[in-house]
Structures are given as structure tokens and as C-alpha cells.
């Protein structure tokens, strides 16, 4: 996920999924790092590479003592894939309650937003108690809500 401020982009972005192939740490301030993990869903990578990413992500989630939140990015335009569901369930099994970032919100009509969010919730089998934030890198929709949530976590 790329959240930009007026000065810089914290994570490189690409039109092609699967470009992040390592764990990348971005120093935001003295209290906060943003950690970008490899994607899994639409990446054009072979099975061995995806398995390596899975192990890398699992090791990071198990070993990180400072991890406060996991954001799971899912394309709002589609029903959750089996990989999305597996990843959500796996993150929960590791003791985290992921925040769902419903990406590409600018690609659907505003009138379809709630319907698409309901499709995501149904597909993931989650209730309204799970935070889901519609997000667009293009329009910056959801950016402030994400930062507000991060700041709240940093204060706890």
C-alpha cells in the first residue's frame, strides 16, 4: 500500500502486482515504522517464490515484538479470492485482528461502495466489528482514516 504525503511516497508502487519481494522497512518517525510485506494474490510468481514469501511473512509475524497492526489489502472490485480468505484467517490465527484496506475504491461508483464492502465482508465471513477502510491511492480516499487509526495505536 502506498500512502503518500505531499513530500514523498513511503513505498514504491507498480502497476504490476507482486513487485514487493522482500520485507521493506520505512522509518516514519521515532515511534513508527511502516513495514511492506510481499503480496500474494495477483502476483505473477511461481509457486516456489510465493512459498518463500509465505515463510518470510510468517517468520516476521512470529518474531516481531513491536508489531501493533496488520493491514490486509484487498481489491474492492472483486469478491475476496481464496488467497484473501486464507490470509485473513491465517492472520487471525496468529493473534492479530487485521484491518481490511479495500483498495481501488476510485474504480467503482460511489453508489456501489457499500455493496462492494458487503461483498468483501460476506466473502471473508466477517462482521461490521472488523474495521474496513475503502482506499484509493489516486484520490487519497481513506488516507486520513488510516493515519488516524495508526496514530491512535501509537498513543496506546
Residue ranges and their predicted role:
Residues 79-94, 114-120:
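Conserved catalytic-core segment of NTP-binding enzymes
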Residues 1-5:
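Conserved small/polar residues in nucleotide/adenosyl-binding loops
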Residues 6-30:
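Switch I (effector-binding) loop of TRAFAC-class P-loop GTPase G-domains
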Residues 49-77, 89-101:
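Inter-motif core of Ras-like GTPase G domains
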Residues 108-156:
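Canonical P-loop GTPase G-domain recognition
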Residues 40-50, 77, 106-109:
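Flexible beta-alpha connector loops of hexameric P-loop NTPases
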Residues 36:
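Conserved active-site aspartate in kinases
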Residues 20, 50-54, 64, 81, ...:
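Amphipathic alpha-helical transducer elements in NTP-driven molecular machines
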